[in-house]
Amino acid sequence: MRSNYIVIEGLEGAGKTTARNVVVDTLKELGIEQMVFTREPGGTQLAEKLRSLVLDIKSVGDEVIDVKAEVLMFYAARVQLVETVIKPALAEGQWVIGDRHDLSTQAYQGGGRGIDQQMLATLRNAVLGDFRPNLTLYLDVTPEVGLKRARARGELDRIEQESLDFFNRTRARYLELAAQDDSIRTIDATQSLEGVTRSIRETITAWLQEQQA
């Protein structure tokens, strides 16, 4: 079976870490052992420094990060990760399991921040070309539920401290994009842990069967 790039997406508190564990267990049960794990922003020395700049509320003191500067930092981190980690791993036959990818930018910056979608499309095409995940699992949860979970984890980062309206716009854009792309599968993340686990397993199994058809 050829290598694939699977990405897990969702709002803060959607349960991405739990979902990743389910994905890994499911793939291992199917005999897939060679996996590389990534997160965005991050995953390389350069990308991790950019992550700190864009997410740590103390990284630039009182300076306000312009929304366009923010999106450019996300893309700088992304291209470094894709070119130095993800593509080489896929070429070696390893599966890549990612915590966030470009869909986050389309939802958070395009939906939440309201950045022009044509600008984002131009950036995406310039940086990524036709590179896309083979499968994206979007964990759908209301902002109220997600933020409650996130707050329970401890201190929030710069984006996690955004308004409820911001996250409502972000979620709406996620759902809009998921409805337009067959490679994005929506998982109801408000279910019980058992329900989410079952949904992810069923989704991956069905997707793999589609690939082999």
Curated annotation (Swiss-Prot):
CDD domains hit by this protein: TMPK
Protein name as annotated: Thymidylate kinase
HAMAP family from the UniProt entry: Thymidylate_kinase
InterPro entries in UniProt: P-loop_NTPase, Thymidylate_kin-like_dom, Thymidylate_kin_CS, Thymidylate_kinase
Recorded catalytic activity of this chain's protein: dTMP + ATP = dTDP + ADP
GO biological process: dTDP biosynthetic process; dTTP biosynthetic process; dUDP biosynthetic process
Single Gene Ontology MF annotation: dTMP kinase activity
GO cellular component: cytosol
Domain of life, per lineage: Bacteria
EC number: 2.7.4.9
Keywords assigned: ATP-binding, Kinase, Nucleotide biosynthesis, Nucleotide-binding, Transferase
Nucleotide-binding in keyword set: yes
Major enzyme class: transferase
Family: Belongs to the thymidylate kinase family.
Name of the encoding gene: tmk
